[in-house]
């Protein structure tokens, strides 16, 4: 099964956050790379806690960051 994890930048809080409704998962971090690693650790744990099969499992990360430049 594939789980899509949406990652976005919160400019006000100055953090990256990740949300996945199918796992369920909601995490945040100051570092994009650290957030990816946290997701890879937390996803199987959350799947197990919610009695979902953790394996085989694929995570698809979709990231977005918007900036005002003018």
Task: Identify what each model region corresponds to.
Residues 6-8, 28:
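Generic structural detector for well-ordered beta-strands
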Residues 15-17, 28, 37:
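Short acidic, gly/pro-rich beta-turn/loop elements at beta-sheet edges
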Residues 8-21:
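Short aromatic-glycine-(Arg/Gly/Cys) micro-motifs in beta-strand/loop hairpins
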Residues 23-34:
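A short, exposed loop/beta-hairpin motif centered on an aromatic-Gly-Thr core
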Residues 17, 24-25, 69:
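Amphipathic alpha-helical interaction segments
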Residues 1, 21-23:
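Short strand-coil-strand connectors
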Residues 1-6, 33-70:
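Short, charged, surface-exposed hinge/linker loops at domain edges
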């Amino acid at each position: 099964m594939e789980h899509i994890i949406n990652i976005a930048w919160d400019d006000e809080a100055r953090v990256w956050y990740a949300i996945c409704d199918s796992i369920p998962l909601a995490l945040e971090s100051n570092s994009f790379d650290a957030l990816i690693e946290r997701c890879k650790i937390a996803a199987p744990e959350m799947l197990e806690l919610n009695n979902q099969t953790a394996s085989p499992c694929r995570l698809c990360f979709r990231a977005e960051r918007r900036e005002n430049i003018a």
